[in-house]
Amino acid sequence: TKVLFAALLLSATTAFAQQEKLGSGIDKANMDLTIKPGNDFYRYAAGNWMKNNPLDAEHTDNGAFTDLFEQNQKRIQDIILEYASKPQQKGSLEQKIGSLYNLRMDSVRLNKEGWAPIKPTLDRIAAIKDRREYQLVTAQLDFRGEGTMMFGIGVDADLRDAANNIVQVGQGGIGLGVRDYYVNDDAQTKKIREAYKAYMKKLFQMVGNDEATAQKKMEAVMAIETRIAKASYSQVQLRDIDKNYHKMTYNQLVIDYPGIDWGNVFLASGFPAFKEICVGQPEPIHEVEKVLAETSLDDLKTYAEIKVIAGATSVLSDDFRAVAFELSKVMSGVQQDRPRWKRAVGTVSGVLGEAIGKIYVEKYFPESSKKRMLDLVHNLQTALAQRIDEA
């Protein structure tokens, strides 16, 4: 038996040796071997690739995922152009896709309209008479995607019961997105903060305010956002599930946070009746209560105004887009804006994403690819389950 086993082992080894040897998945030409891996492993592993594939003026990164993204942008444009290049049945999904794309590409019309498309919304904000109406109107506008509320609301998986969804409230309301931009004092952060102030002031001027008024409005918004930011959680704190999970009944929410008109907020936001809610970060929500109570109504309306204006910069005339891109250059380092067709594709994908996705899958994602991905996910789940069981 031992002799037979040895013979089989030798035979298998010989057969294996006769097979074509697989090459290494590591291409040393991409490495920078002059760098010590202990000092900068990333440059050690990919330094020469980075030298040979420099960033262009339009992108903040480079690599396979960037290439795939750009490939998909072109594919989506091809899909859209099928409907945008010829008349479609009125009211059909195809007509909506084509018309939206053509509108975004019509620079003559957009530049002629200027900020007229958002004037009715700004007029509605200006007409607000009291704080209760302010909360109602800003909730209605936020539901439309204007971003006018000082916190975020939505529905997501319960972090302690992933099989069920739950209504969630969390920090938000700051234009720069991250707390650090408001509280840190390093040179780069200060530069970003000043660029943001200049950006807001310019936008206020572009919708009819003189320089002094625009300056005053900018300062009012900055004061509100800084208050909220200082109370908000840092990026590190946001990683702690326990500190970001405060489940309660709706009735308890109303008791614990009385400074927010929750009934009108949820009604205006399209929520049906619900029993439970999770508050992610209590401190910034309490700070919003104080801001709503202590800030003048005019300054509150100014805050809502800038959210509407800033949110529309990508779909208004070219001068609004240019101002927004100047801020983007400071924050991201990108030196060249995306061409108009890419921005138009982005708008259509954002507004009619599910429809575009369905068409994309039918054209570019065959059943065989779906099976491969399902198998991959299944294998990943199995491997992770095994690791959890063995831990």
Where are the regions a protein language model picked out?
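Bacterial Sec-dependent N-terminal signal peptides
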Residues: T1-E20
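Short, intrinsically disordered, charge-balanced linker/junction segments flanking boundaries
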Residues: T13-F16, E133, L384-E390
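Short, Gly/Pro- and small/polar-rich lid/capping loops
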Residues: Q19-A29
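A charge-rich, low-complexity, intrinsically flexible signal that marks solvent-exposed coils, linkers
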Residues: A29, L33-P37
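Active-site-surrounding "flap" and adjacent substrate/cofactor-binding loops of secreted or lumenal enzymes
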Residues: K36-N39, Y44-R109
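Noncatalytic, helix-rich "gating/capping" subdomain that lines the substrate-entry/channel surface
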Residues: Y83-L374, N379
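Zn2+-dependent metallopeptidase catalytic core
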Residues: M373-A391
